[in-house]
From Swiss-Prot:
Pfam families: tRNA-synt_2 (PF00152), tRNA_anti-codon (PF01336). This is Asparagine--tRNA ligase. Keywords: Aminoacyl-tRNA synthetase, ATP-binding, Cytoplasm, Ligase, Nucleotide-binding, Protein biosynthesis. It comes from Colwellia psychrerythraea (strain 34H / ATCC BAA-681) (Vibrio psychroerythus). Belongs to the class-II aminoacyl-tRNA synthetase family. HAMAP family: Asn_tRNA_synth. Its main location: cytoplasm. It catalyses: tRNA(Asn) + L-asparagine + ATP = L-asparaginyl-tRNA(Asn) + AMP + diphosphate + H(+).
Length: 466
C-alpha cells in the first residue's frame, strides 16, 4: 500500500474528482445542523491540515464519526475536490471513515485543541510533536539537517562517523560524562586507593565525547575535506536557554586551510541553510513569523544578504570598553566574552553577523594554533544577532613542539594524545575547522527562545525524562 501524504495532496499532485485515501489524526471536528461533520486532518507532512466533509449517511457516522476528538487516528476515503472556501485549495468529500485509534479519555488528553505554554509542552515531550509548534520545529530541524549534508556534499566533503565514547578530553575543560560498567557500590581500588579503571570495560577511563573534532582530524589528514554531524555531551551544570547536556554538532575539517578559509566556509554554509529553509518550509516559517517571532524572516534574510564582519578580539575589547554601555560583566583584555558582550557587538554595534577572531591563548583550547605574537591563537567565534555565538572554530596547531607545549600548559597528559600527536609526526599540514551547535541553529531559524524546545528530548541538569 502506498500511503498518500497530505502535503502531496495540497500541492495538487493528485487529480480532482477522483477517489483518494489518506491517513492522519484529527485536529478538530465541527458538526453542522445539516447533519454534516467537518474533520480537519493532519499527518505531520506539512503544517496545514486538510478538511474532510463527512455526511451523516455513513453507516458509522453516529457510532464513530460523532465520537472523534482531537488526536484520534483515522483512515479517510473520498472524492478529492477543489475547496470553495478560503484557506486551502482542496478538500475531501468522504465516502468512508475508518477509525484506527480513539483517544482514550478526551477530557484528560494533554494535547487537547487549545494553545499550551512552551513549558507545559516541554513536560509532554512525547506528545509535543503533535502540536503545531512541535511539528513545525521538527520539520524545520529536518530541513536544516538535510541542507547541511547537501551543502557539504556539494563542496566535496566526506561525512565521517566519529565515536561517542572517548578517552580524550577535546576541550580540556573536564566537563565530561563518565562511561563505566564498574559496580558503583563496590569500586575496585589500586594500591594508591584510587579507582582502578584497568578493571573497567575498556580498561581505562572513558567518557561521552564533547566533540568529534579530534577524531575527524585524523580523516582530514587523509581525505582533505571531511565533517562529522552527531550528538555530543557536556556535563556542564548550566540552566540557561542556550545550553544542553546532550546536543548535536556539525564539525567540518579542512586540510591545507587557515582560519580565514574556515570562516569563509562557515559563512557560506549559514547562508545556504537559511536560504534552504526559507525556500523549502514556507508554511512552517510563516507560522513562526506569525506566532513566535515577528522578526525571524527579516533576520534570516539579513544574514543571507549581509557580508560577515571580521573582527579581532583585541579590537572587540576596545569597542566594548569605549561603547559607554554598562555591562553586568566588565570586560578587559584576556577575559572570555559573555553573551551580553557578543550580542552587543552583533546586534547594536555592527547590526549583523560578526566573525570574532584571534583570542587570547589562555581562554582557548590546546589544539588551536598559536599566533606569531605568542599571546593569541587563531580561533574564531561567529556571533549572530539575536543569539550570540552560533559557531566556534580555529586553525589547528600543526607543529608538534608547540602542540606539546600547549598540552603541558593546560595540564593534560601527553600520553592520552599519542595518536593525535602522530598526525603532526607523519606529514603534518595546516588545517582548520569549526563546530556549529545545531540546536542553536534551529533556534535561530525558528525564533524559539530556548534550545530545549528545538530538540526532541532535551537533556539538562536534573532532567532525563523520556
Amino acid at each position: 500500500m502506498s500511503v498518500i501524504s497530505i502535503t502531496d495532496v495540497l500541492a495538487g499532485n493528485f487529480p480532482v474528482n477522483e477517489s483518494i485515501t489518506i491517513h492522519g489524526w484529527i485536529r478538530t471536528r465541527r458538526d453542522s445542523k445539516a447533519g454534516i461533520s467537518f474533520l480537519a486532518l493532519h499527518d505531520g507532512s506539512c503544517f496545514d491540515a486538510i478538511q474532510a466533509i463527512v455526511p451523516n449517511e455513513l453507516d458509522n457516522y453516529e457510532s464513530d464519526v460523532l465520537k472523534l476528538t482531537t488526536g484520534c487516528s483515522v483512515k479517510v476515503t473520498g472524492i478529492l475536490v477543489e475547496s470553495p472556501g478560503k484557506g486551502q485549495a482542496f478538500e475531501i468529500q468522504a465516502t468512508e471513515v475508518e477509525v484506527l485509534g480513539f483517544v482514550e479519555d478526551p477530557d484528560t488528553y494533554p494535547m487537547a485543541a487549545k494553545r499550551h505554554s512552551i513549558e507545559f509542552l516541554r513536560e509532554q515531550a512525547h506528545l509535543r510533536p503533535r502540536t503545531n509548534i512541535g511539528g513545525a520545529v521538527t520539520r524545520v530541524r529536518n530541513c536544516l539537517a538535510q541542507a547541511v549534508h547537501r551543502f557539504l556534499h556539494s563542496k566535496g566533503y566526506f561525512w565521517i562517523s566519529t565515536p561517542l565514547i572517548t578517552g580524550s578530553d577535546c576541550e580540556g575543560a573536564g566537563e565530561m560524562f563518565r562511561v563505566s560498567t564498574l559496580d558503583m557500590e563496590n569500586l575496585p581500588r589500586n594500591d594508591e586507593g584510587k579507582v582502578d579503571y584497568n578493571k573497567d570495560f575498556f580498561g581505562k577511563e572513558t567518557f561521552l565525547t564533547v566533540s568529534g573534532q579530534l577524531n575527524v582530524e585524523t580523516y582530514c589528514n587523509a581525505l582533505s575535506k571531511v565533517y562529522t554531524f552527531g550528538p555530543t555531551f557536556r556535563a556542564e551544570n548550566s540552566n540557561t536557554t542556550r545550553h544542553l547536556a546532550e546536543f548535536w554538532m556539525v564539525e567540518p575539517e579542512i586540510a591545507f586551510a587557515d582560519l580565514s578559509d574556515a570562516a569563509d566556509l562557515a559563512e557560506e554554509m549559514l547562508k545556504y541553510v537559511f536560504k534552504a529553509v526559507l525556500e523549502e518550509r514556507p508554511d512552517d516559517m510563516a507560522f513562526f513569523q506569525q506566532r513566535v517571532d515577528k522578526t525571524v524572516l527579516d533576520r534570516l534574510n539579513s544574514v543571507i544578504n549581509t557580508d560577515f564582519v571580521r573582527l579581532d578580539y583585541t579590537d572587540a575589547i576596545t569597542i566594548l570598553e569605549n561603547c559607554g554601555k554598562k555591562f553586568e560583566n566588565q570586560v578587559s583584555w584576556g577575559v572570555d566574552l559573555n553573551s551580553e558582550h557578543e550580542r552587543y557587538l552583533a546586534e547594536e554595534h555592527f547590526n549583523g553577523p560578526v566573525v570574532l577572531q584571534n583570542y587570547p591563548k589562555d581562554i582557548k583550547s590546546f589544539y588551536m594554533r598559536l599566533n606569531d605574537d605568542g599571546k593569541t591563537v587563531a580561533a574564531m567565534d561567529i556571533l549572530a544577532p539575536g543569539i550570540g555565538e552560533i559557531i566556534g572554530g580555529s586553525q589547528r596547531e600543526e607543529r608538534l613542539d608547540v602542540l606539546d607545549s600547549r598540552l603541558e600548559e593546560m595540564g593534560l597528559d601527553i600520553a592520552d594524545y599519542g595518536w593525535y600527536r602522530d598526525l603532526r609526526r607523519y606529514g603534518t599540514v595546516p588545517h582548520s575547522g569549526f563546530g556549529l551547535g545545531f540546536e542553536r541553529l534551529v533556534a535561530y531559524a525558528t525564533g524559539m527562545q530556548n534550545v530545549r524546545d528545538v530538540i526532541p528530548f532535551p537533556r539538562t541538569p536534573n532532567n532525563a525524562a523520556f
